[in-house]
Regions:
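Short, conserved recognition motifs on repeat-domain binding surfaces
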Residues: 1-385
Length: 385
């Protein structure tokens, strides 16, 4: 007797199963619009705001480098880096502050941009995807009138409703003290001030946070370069809520201004340090021995002229560091023949732009889903695909 025929497999129409499949599409801007072109059912799911949030959360740790917010002394604009059909239009992210106003871009992270609105003495947390803006008053205790400040923004994994801001600077009571505080949008308040001594003032030269390098997150800590009477790095441990100073392995304040030094993750893990001298890139790593003593160790040295096929005799200037994209672990390097991304562990590189004299270049990473509704998805497909 033959066994009964198994029932035919049901067509793929289960919302949950399809959602799990679509979640695993690459985090490129064209992925969901392309999926939505399959049929009305797929389009309904791909354009659903709730699914869009899930898609962004799923790819939070591997978002593409969408572009950079560049400041050319006249205005700030979004400079896209991806090729069509994944290229986010330049007009998609108009800058949050009008040209001519005084401000500093303090960094980008987790799809948010953090800005110090100097004329208002406020921090602005801006979500370019939604246009949402949150303004935060600087808490008491920071000498914002006399010194520079640094800050970093972050989100908890999968949380697109709340954020934290870490603020560091000089104490307004004792300028040779570094202070820090953390703001939570969940509570709407700043934590108590944390402090640590800075090097003493020398000939009127005060040590303060260097704003030319945005905060870099390595593990559970943020790092800033210190400018002035110091060759040190300021560390803020987010879990322990503590500040500490770490000596730089090499370099000085002049190297900061010339774009020769940057804090970054080390190869393998831990705290790293990139130092440029001419066409040579040195990769340093912070190591701790069995006695708990930490020190810097020089790892690899890389000839950038050979890696990037630069003619060292014809180059107008030496390479310099423009920025660092944390999630993609790539450094943005300026050269006279173009601006490159370099992944130093794999030695992979890509030319992004022709050379520009930009005052500031902040890499912007995130999962951009190209549209908020069905009609915008169709417009995206008509334009690019």
């Amino acid at each position: 007797m033959s066994s009964p025929r198994s029932s035919a497999a049901a067509p793929l129409d289960d919302d949950d199963l399809l959602a799990e499949i679509l979640l695993r599409l690459p985090p490129q801007p064209s992925s969901l619009p392309r999926a939505s072109a399959v049929c009305k059912f797929w389009r309904s799911l791909a354009s659903d705001p709730g699914f869009s949030r899930r898609f962004r959360a799923h790819h939070r740790r591997n978002p593409p480098l969408l572009g950079c917010f560049v400041h050319d002394f006249c205005e700030v604009r979004f400079q896209p880096t991806l090729e069509p059909p994944n290229r986010a239009p330049q007009s998609r992210f108009p800058f949050a502050i009008a040209a001519g106003d005084r401000f500093h871009i303090l960094g980008c992270r987790h799809g948010l941009v953090l800005i110090f609105h100097d004329s208002q003495k406020q921090l602005l947390v801006w979500d370019p995807f939604t246009g949402d803006q949150h303004r935060l008053d600087i808490p008491p205790g920071f000498a914002v009138e006399k010194t520079w400040i640094g800050a970093a923004v972050l989100r908890a994994p999968g949380d697109f409703h709340h954020f934290q801001v870490v603020l560091v600077g000089n104490s307004d009571i004792q300028s040779t003290q570094a202070v820090a505080s953390v703001y939570s949008s969940l509570t709407g308040v700043w934590d108590r001030l944390i402090s640590t001594p800075l090097p003493p003032e020398d000939s009127g030269f005060l040590t303060m946070v260097y704003t030319g390098m945005p905060a870099v997150m390595v593990g559970g800590s943020f790092y800033w370069l210190l400018y002035g009477n110091s060759q040190e790095i300021l560390e803020f441990d987010l879990d322990k809520r503590s500040l500490a100073l770490i000596p730089m392995p090499v370099g000085n304040t002049r190297d900061m201004g010339e774009g020769n030094i940057w804090v970054m993750p080390a190869e393998g893990a831990g705290l790293g340090f990139l130092f440029l001298r001419g066409f040579c890139a040195q990769l340093w790593k912070r190591k701790t021995d069995c006695k708990g003593v930490s020190s810097w160790v020089l790892g690899r040295s890389i000839d950038l002229d050979k890696l990037l096929s630069l003619n060292s005799e014809m180059e107008i200037g030496y390479p310099s560091i423009l920025g660092f994209a944390e999630d993609n672990n790539v450094v943005l390097l300026w050269t006279s023949v173009g601006i490159f991304t370099v992944q130093f562990e794999s030695l992979q590189f890509k030319k992004l732009f022709e050379s520009h004299d930009w005052y500031r270049c902040c890499p912007f990473e995130g999962v951009y889903t190209a549209g908020k509704n069905k009609s915008s998805y169709l417009m995206f497909l008509d334009y690019y695909c």
